[in-house]
Each structure stands twice: as structure tokens, then as C-alpha cells.
From Swiss-Prot:
<feature type="binding site">
    <location>
        <position position="27"/>
    </location>
    <ligand>
        <name>K(+) 1</name>
    </ligand>
</feature>
<feature type="active site" description="Charge relay system">
    <location>
        <position position="464"/>
    </location>
</feature>
<feature type="binding site">
    <location>
        <position position="180"/>
    </location>
    <ligand>
        <name>K(+) 1</name>
    </ligand>
</feature>
<feature type="active site" description="Nucleophile">
    <location>
        <position position="286"/>
    </location>
</feature>
<feature type="binding site">
    <location>
        <begin position="176"/>
        <end position="179"/>
    </location>
    <ligand>
        <name>NAD(+)</name>
    </ligand>
</feature>
<comment type="subunit">
    <text>Dimer of dimers.</text>
</comment>
<feature type="active site" description="Charge relay system">
    <location>
        <position position="162"/>
    </location>
</feature>
<keyword id="KW-0479">Metal-binding</keyword>
<feature type="binding site">
    <location>
        <begin position="230"/>
        <end position="233"/>
    </location>
    <ligand>
        <name>NAD(+)</name>
    </ligand>
</feature>
<feature type="binding site">
    <location>
        <position position="93"/>
    </location>
    <ligand>
        <name>K(+) 1</name>
    </ligand>
</feature>
<keyword id="KW-0558">Oxidation</keyword>
<comment type="pathway">
    <text>Amine and polyamine biosynthesis; betaine biosynthesis via choline pathway; betaine from betaine aldehyde: step 1/1.</text>
</comment>
<dbReference type="InterPro" id="IPR016161">
    <property type="entry name" value="Ald_DH/histidinol_DH"/>
</dbReference>
<dbReference type="InterPro" id="IPR011264">
    <property type="entry name" value="BADH"/>
</dbReference>
<dbReference type="GO" id="GO:0008802">
    <property type="term" value="F:betaine-aldehyde dehydrogenase (NAD+) activity"/>
</dbReference>
<comment type="function">
    <text>Involved in the biosynthesis of the osmoprotectant glycine betaine. Catalyzes the irreversible oxidation of betaine aldehyde to the corresponding acid.</text>
</comment>
<keyword id="KW-0520">NAD</keyword>
């Protein structure tokens, strides 16, 4: 017996049965409990959602900027009023510690929505003089119907990061959450409707990326895809979107980010930064700094500080607010992470701590993996080359600044990077040479609503958050006005 009732699709401002009886299970990864049975959208459901979105978008775009802004601000208020309720549901569905979801997931998502709600009246064009009798003006117009495809690690936050600029610009969005974590996105759809967003402007289709995601990327009347997920899937999304109708695509993809500890760094601060860059959200953050570069002569001292801090991690029931490290998001993902850990051991990396599944007591029912630190790693090891998306830190030693910059950039990814140093001249000098779209100096992980985020190389296309994301959900129309006589050459 599932804890919650059957989860339906959300189309045209209300819950709606899918076109088939097929469902999948939402599983609590802390104990294997079936939380809910979730309906799988069909291709016909995708078409229904598009028709609904087209209708709603016309109503939404016709509203004044202040009207749209006020409605989105009401949604912000509702999100904040229901913060704890939504955070508790997110914890059940993802396994993330309530101490995290309560203070981060809904809070930061609401901040992004508030930011874009404030920018709605600021969407403006330009006036360009040509001569005394003629000028050009530009308009920023909504794209129309767009689609968002989310990842499983920050379900409601990602849904808000994508829907906030889209709706602020006057678009309608069809959102497909990850099949692994679908529950809070459906609640977000309810909140948008309650706040006054017209029916159809935010529809939610649940199901697999292979089916529902593909139908969305291929649909000829969807103008843009905003995708968060793995690099391999992102390549397929881009190919599908361009083949069907030359859709605009924004993608936030994988990473294998470097964290460089300099020889002048405060080692306590360096260790604290490395812990946040590797074990926050049980290591399931795309920007994690999993390649930690440490000067050779400081490696032993740094390792000791890391081991000390790992011992203080409070692994446990994620619903307990004292817990700060929960299970991985699913049992299949746990097996993937354990496979990488086994590979690290096989290839000669030394386990400093962790390195196994936790099975004592209540842990046996869940997808718990011990916080794991490998040292004596080399650049060619699988755990150093590939994104693990779990609580696995790899410590690498280096000798010179030139060397560490070269090695930090020796990756197909380019999502994030960081440096810990007391010398700000060095910090900027190194950061400016790192091939990464998001960089931190003496910190790790904060992504404010005003901060554009996205990757270099195979870590993404385009940016989310900041003013640039709002502009990316509009298209520019140029209009020339002639006030004088018009003379034909014919």
C-alpha cells in the first residue's frame, strides 16, 4: 500500500488521468517504502498538454507585465508558507536530509521566482535612430510554448529555475520531472494555479525521459527545451531538438570539477571547503569539486583534517533534522556509485575512509553509501575521469601552479572550479585560466538567483539564472518605422 494516492498528470490547471493505466513507483530511498504510484504520460497526453499550453500562453502573454509579476509574487508567498510541508515531501522522495531541504531547496527556488517576478516589468526593447525621418525599435517577445526537463537531485528547485524565467517572459512551460523524483513538481503546479497563473501555463507530465522527454524534444510546436541532466542524455536532447524543428536549447549537464588547494591556504578552511564540495546532498550535486588538488608537502596534513571531518558527518534518517547526510536517491544509483568505488580500489587508489555500503541496523533498508575519500589518485583513474554523482572525493597531489592548472583543465567537462588561497592575486590569476563556467574563491557551492550558472565544454549550453536566462526565453523582433516619404527604385 502506497503512502500517497495515485499521482496524476497536471494539465490545464487540474489533475488529469493519463491516456493509459501504466504507472511507476515513487520510492523512499531511506527505507524502500513505496510512496506513490505515478502515472506515465502517453504521446497523446503530450499533445493535450501542448494544446492546453498554447491556449494558456496567449492569455498569459496578453496580461500586463505588472499583472504577471503580481501573480508570480503570490506563488512565491505560497511557496514560503508551505516551505516545511514541501521540504518534508522532498526529503521522502529524494532521501535528502530535511536539514537541507528545509533551508535550501524550496527557499532558493522561491528566491529565483521572486527575482524574476521583479524583472517582469523590466523586459524592454531598444530604440535605434537611423536618420531624422526613420528609426528602428525592438521588442522582446515570448517564445510561446517551451519545455523543461528536470534532474532528480533538486526536483522543485530545478522546476523553479526553469519555470520562473520562462513564465516571467510570458511563455507557457510543459515540465517533465525526473521519473525518480516527481512528487514536489506536481505540488508546484498546484501552487501556480492557486496563485492565479492561467490554466495551461504550467503543465506537468510524468514519465520516462526515453518516452516523454523524447516526445517533448521532438514536438514541432515546442519552441525551446531547457534540460538538466547527464552529458550523454544532453547530446541526445540537442540532436532530437535540432532535428525536429531547430528548437533553442539550454542545457546544464555533468561535471568533474577541480578544487585547488594552494600552498598558502588555511588548511582548516580548505578542508571545510572540500567537505562542502563533495558531501553536501550526499554528494549528488552536479557542481561538486570531486577532484581535490593538494600540494604534495601538505597532502598528509590535509588528509588528516578530512578524515577528522568525515567522522563528524551525521549519517541517518533524513527525516531527522539532526541528520546532515542521507541515502542516495535510489537503489540503482547506489549500485552505480558502489561500482565506481570498486573501480577506484581496483585501479590502485587508497581508501582513506568509507568505501562501502552502510548496512547496520536501519541502514540495511536504504540506499546508504558511506562518505568515501580516495587518496594517492592519478589523473587516468576512472574515479578521476568520470562523473560519479555520489559521495566520493579523490585527492590528487601537485607540485606547481602551472601543473595544477593544466591538470585541472584536462577533462571533457567544464561546469565548475574553485581555489582556496590567501593570495587574491593568485586566486584571480588561476581562476581566469580554468575552463569552467562557475568558479568559487575560498568557498564552494552558492548559486544566487542573480548569478548566471552553466558550463564550458561538455558541461552545458547557455546559462540559467541571472538576467541572461530571462532574455533567453524571449525572441527579438526588429521594427523599422519610416516617417518621411518612401521612394521605390521601380
Amino acid at each position: 500500500m502506497a503512502r500517497f494516492e495515485l499521482q496524476k498528470l497536471y494539465i490545464d490547471g487540474a489533475y488529469s488521468d493519463a491516456g493509459s493505466d501504466a504507472t511507476f513507483e515513487a520510492i523512499n530511498p531511506a527505507n524502500g517504502e513505496v510512496l506513490a504510484h505515478v502515472q506515465r504520460a502517453t504521446k497523446e497526453d503530450v499533445e493535450r498538454a501542448v494544446v492546453s499550453a498554447e491556449k494558456g500562453q496567449k492569455i498569459w502573454a496578453a496580461m500586463t507585465a505588472m499583472e504577471r509579476s503580481r501573480i508570480l509574487r503570490r506563488a512565491v508567498d505560497i511557496l514560503r508558507e508551505r516551505n516545511d510541508e514541501l521540504a518534508a515531501l522532498e526529503t521522502l522522495d529524494t532521501g535528502k536530509a530535511f536539514s537541507e531541504t528545509k533551508y535550501v531547496d524550496i527557499v532558493t527556488g522561491a528566491d529565483v521566482l521572486e527575482y524574476y517576478a521583479g524583472l517582469v516589468p523590466a523586459i524592454e526593447g531598444e530604440q535605434i535612430p537611423l536618420r531624422d525621418t526613420s528609426f528602428v525599435y525592438t521588442r522582446r517577445e515570448p517564445l510561446g510554448v517551451v519545455a523543461g526537463i528536470g534532474a532528480w537531485n533538486y526536483p522543485i528547485q530545478i522546476a523553479l529555475w526553469k519555470s520562473a524565467p520562462a513564465l516571467a517572459a510570458g511563455n507557457a512551460m510543459i515540465f517533465k520531472p525526473s521519473e525518480v523524483t516527481s512528487l514536489t513538481t506536481l505540488k508546484l503546479a498546484e501552487i501556480y494555479t492557486e496563485a492565479g497563473v492561467p490554466n495551461g501555463v504550467f503543465n506537468v507530465l510524468t514519465g520516462s525521459g526515453r518516452e516523454v522527454g523524447t516526445w517533448l524534444t521532438e514536438h514541432p510546436r515546442i519552441e525551446k527545451i531547457s534540460f538538466t541532466g547527464g552529458t550523454d542524455t544532453g547530446k541526445k536532447v540537442m540532436a532530437s531538438a535540432s532535428a525536429s524543428s531547430l528548437k533553442d536549447v539550454t542545457m546544464e549537464l555533468g561535471g568533474k570539477s577541480p578544487l585547488i588547494i594552494c600552498d598558502d591556504a588555511d588548511l582548516d578552511r580548505a578542508a571545510d571547503t572540500a567537505m562542502m564540495a563533495n558531501f553536501y546532498s550526499s554528494g549528488q550535486v552536479c557542481t561538486n569539486g570531486t577532484r581535490v588538488f593538494v600540494p604534495s608537502h601538505l597532502k598528509a596534513a590535509f588528509e588528516a583534517k578530512i578524515v577528522e571531518r568525515v567522522a563528524r558527518i551525521r549519517v541517518g534518517n533524513p527525516e531527522d533534522e539532526n541528520t546532515n547526510f542521507g541515502p542516495l536517491v535510489s537503489f540503482p544509483h547506489m549500485e552505480s556509485v558502489l561500482g565506481y568505488i570498486a573501480k577506484g580500489k581496483e585501479e590502485g587508489a587508497r581508501v582513506l575512509c568509507g568505501g562501502e555500503r552502510l548496512t547496520d541496523g536501519e541502514f540495511a533498508k536504504g540506499a546508504f553509501v558511506a562518505p568515501t575519500v580516495f587518496t594517492d589518485c592519478t589523473d587516468d583513474m576512472t574515479i578521476v575521469r568520470e562523473e560519479i554523482f555520489g559521495p566520493v572525493m579523490a585527492i590528487l597531489s601537485y607540485e606547481t601552479e602551472e601543473e595544477v592548472i593544466r591538470r585541472a583543465n584536462d577533462t571533457d567537462f567544464g561546469l565548475a572550479a574553485g581555489i582556496v588561497t590567501r593570495d587574491l592575486n593568485r586566486a584571480h590569476r588561476v581562476i581566469h585560466q580554468l575552463e569552467a563556467g562557475i568558479c568559487w574563491i575560498n568557498a564552494w557551492g552558492e548559486s544566487d538567483a542573480k548569478m548566471p550558472v552553466g558550463g564550458y565544454k561538455q558541461s552545458g549550453v547557455g546559462r540559467e539564472n541571472g538576467i541572461s536566462s530571462l532574455n533567453n526565453f524571449t525572441r527579438i523582433k526588429s521594427v523599422q518605422v519610416e516617417l518621411g516619404d518612401y521612394v521605390s527604385v521601380f
